């Protein structure tokens, strides 16, 4: 039987950061992703030493292994707007510092949108921004993980080459990794719904990034192949198909990569539980139901 990779969900921290581990344990997670602050605000409330200590203790005491964080959606490292770029750099630096205090290993961030300036200019700005942020935190043991995108508008990251180019330009590429989202890849035109397309995509990703591939977002897609629209669906309820997820979970090259689902807003826990059950069922053999007659036979034999 194929062993599952570290598998879990993006869990809420409503009620305090440590509640993430309570939700994770209820879902049977062995990996999670969280927000370390409100993702729709530039600044968050101060993280106290006591909060950080309790988070680390809860992590150490439970079944969760890798913990990732997702950076604010407001951050745009690729913009030509100098004021917005500086604000984005400051926000990313702040989240990086929070992750370090909490013991979070990877901080996922979208590369950003060039807003008409062109891909080359945008990629150069992202790399320069990462250099600025990382230079101010030379000893922080947190890797920034660039996430691929669906390719909406002028967003960078719809092709793996963009992420590789950014990493090639930064001064310390070992501190910059990659997190790949299945919905985004499918929407951007990578045929992961087909066996050959899936093999091609993951082989290319591993060739370009190797061990720098440090996270996977397992999301189905509401929109059809190549739509360039980012709309997540529950696993098996979208356009990608269960086969693609089975191939990912059973790929020995990805066995150590933490993978999380990102259910759309709603009944988060119920959605996560269902998605994770579906994913586990693609790898773990289902236990046959015992028939009443079977139980009777066993009972007779025990007399």
Can you describe what each PLM-predicted range is?
Residues 1-71, 75, 79-96, 285-292:
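N-terminal pre-domain/capping segments
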Residues 2, 22-29, 47-68, 93-103, ...:
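Acidic (Asp/Glu)-rich catalytic clusters
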Residues 10-14, 37-39, 71-74, 112-114, ...:
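Active-site beta-loop-alpha junctions enriched in small/polar residues
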Residues 24, 70, 88, 99, ...:
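Conserved, mostly hydrophobic/aromatic
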Residues 30-35, 67-69, 176-182, 210-222:
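Non-cysteine beta-strand/loop elements that form the S-adenosyl-L-methionine
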Residues 77-177:
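Active-site acidic/histidine proton-transfer and metal-coordination neighborhood
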Residues 86, 156-164, 186-256, 270-273:
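Gly/Pro-rich active-site loop or hairpin
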